UniProtKB/Swiss-Prot annotation:
This is 1D-myo-inositol 2-acetamido-2-deoxy-alpha-D-glucopyranoside deacetylase. InterPro entries: GlcNAc_PI_deacetylase-related, LmbE-like_dom_sf, Mycothiol_biosynthesis_MshB. Zn(2+) binds at H15, D18, H149. Transmembrane segments: none annotated. One of its GO terms (molecular function) is zinc ion binding. Its EC number is 3.5.1.103. Its cofactor is Zn(2+). It comes from the Bacteria. It comes from Mycolicibacterium smegmatis (strain ATCC 700084 / mc(2)155) (Mycobacterium smegmatis). The gene is mshB. One of its GO terms (biological process) is mycothiol biosynthetic process. Belongs to the MshB deacetylase family. Catalyzes the deacetylation of 1D-myo-inositol 2-acetamido-2-deoxy-alpha-D-glucopyranoside (GlcNAc-Ins) in the mycothiol biosynthesis pathway.
Length: 290
């Protein structure tokens, strides 16, 4: 790497709001430290459920205009995190949000049905352009099993593997963004007052997450919570944030904590120094950027 090279990170996400919910604090953290941060979004999020009545008729079973509206939400969210406007894989609208398992096709190519050679090639081209030191996407289950998240995992994994030969760039560190069961448990237990219509749950009711022994890295995003919460509020058709900014809910009204840490599993590359828990505290740890 060249002398005094600026660190470059690439986050690959399925829909608008995923970048904020899973990695928003990390994005803001590295932007604040003058890293070059890129976010690629694979669909417009057309199949999302809409919170509230104001824009409810944008949904797929009415005007089917939600995807276009969510471009503005994603733009505002990225600005809150310190970035410019969105970048969509293949161009805005090239692949459609697939919806949850069992959602019917809407007449355009769904992301879950994307030709893998085309999709991987598009992301390889981004990797060749950005030459990221770190790439982040979902685990094989897509976090919670959403078909588009799983497809994003497959495409990103194949693109990282293909990039050395295709564009001459080997990604030094490749991570999955994951939920730490311990952090979620503590966050749920610490929840204060939430809107009366929200549903409180226990950690055992959330069917995904990783144990501490499976986690390789954590980023303390406490200082970035105002930026993350601002980005969450920008995704107003998808996320409701509690007045105090410490909890949020999606369209299912399940109360979830806004956590001050974001957790990762290192898939490939050499880990840097680890703390007493065995975790890196910097996704760039171990990289020689001088």
């Amino acid at each position: 790497m060249s002398s005094h090279e600026s660190p470059r990170l690439l986050f690959v996400h399925a829909h608008p709001d995923d970048e904020t919910l899973t990695t928003g604090g990390t994005i803001a953290h590295y932007v604040a430290r003058s890293a070059e941060v890129h976010v690629v979004t694979c669909t417009l999020g057309e199949e999302g459920e809409v919170i509230g009545e104001r824009y409810a008729q944008l949904a797929v079973d009415h005007a089917d205009q939600l995807g276009g509206y969510r471009i503005a939400e994603l733009t505002a969210a990225l600005q809150s995190l310190g970035l410019r406007g969105p970048r969509y894989l293949g161009g805005a609208g090239h692949w459609r949000d697939s919806g949850m398992a069992g959602t019917p096709s809407r007449g355009r190519q769904r992301w879950v049905d994307a030709d893998l050679d085309e999709a991987v090639g598009a992301l390889v081209a981004v990797i060749g352009e950005v030459r990221p030191h770190v790439v982040v996407t979902y685990d094989p289950n897509g976090g919670y099993g959403h078909p588009d998240h799983i497809q994003t995992h497959v495409v990103t994994t194949r693109a990282v593997a293909a990039a050395p030969e295709a564009v001459g760039w080997t990604v030094p560190k490749f991570y999955w963004t994951v939920t730490a069961i311990s952090a979620m448990t503590a966050g749920l237990q610490a929840l204060g007052d939430v809107p009366s219509e929200w549903i409180r749950v226990n950690a055992e009711d959330i069917p995904f997450g990783f144990g501490d022994d499976q986690i390789d890295a954590v980023v303390d995003v406490t200082a970035e919570l105002p930026a993350k919460v601002g980005a969450m509020r920008a995704h107003a058709t998808q996320i409701t944030v509690a007045p105090d900014g410490r909890a949020f809910a999606l369209s299912n009204n399940i109360a979830l904590p806004v956590l001050g840490e974001e957790h990762y599993v290192l898939v490939s590359g050499e880990a840097g120094p680890r703390d007493s828990r065995g975790w890196e505290t910097d996704l760039l740890a171990g990289l020689d950027l001088e």
